[in-house]
């Protein structure tokens, strides 16, 4: 079971698209975010590239990121990301924006929107 670990959406379960997409495990996400929060926290814009379920980007939003862009090409994973956004959004501050982009990461990075990005997950 994949879930949001901490923050405003802590313990909410996330949908997964099936065996072809493997979300980052709770244990790995917990280690990543513990380390990052000790350094700087999450308050700006996060890119979640090859987003899969969106778990990393949604975890960042739950912990305070103001804007999260999740880029994923696979249509099944895109549907799951949109479902997970719908699950997590009501728990976030109204100023938080979550964006799902259906594109190949390589194409997205060739002409990205003009954003100041504070963190990138690959």
Regions found by a protein language model. Name each.
Residues 1-122:
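Class I S-adenosyl-L-methionine-dependent methyltransferase catalytic core
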């Amino acid at each position: 079971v994949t879930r949001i670990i901490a923050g405003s959406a802590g313990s909410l379960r996330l949908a997964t698209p099936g065996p072809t997409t493997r979300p980052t495990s709770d244990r790995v996400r917990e280690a990543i975010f513990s380390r990052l929060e000790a350094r700087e926290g999450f308050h700006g814009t996060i890119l979640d590239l090859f987003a899969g379920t969106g778990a990393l980007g949604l975890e960042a939003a739950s912990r305070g990121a103001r804007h999260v862009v999740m880029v994923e090409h696979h249509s099944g994973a895109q549907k799951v990301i949109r479902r997970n956004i719908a699950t997590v959004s009501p728990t976030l501050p109204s100023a938080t924006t979550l964006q799902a982009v259906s594109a190949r990461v390589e194409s997205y990075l060739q002409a990205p929107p003009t954003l100041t990005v504070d963190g990138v997950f690959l």
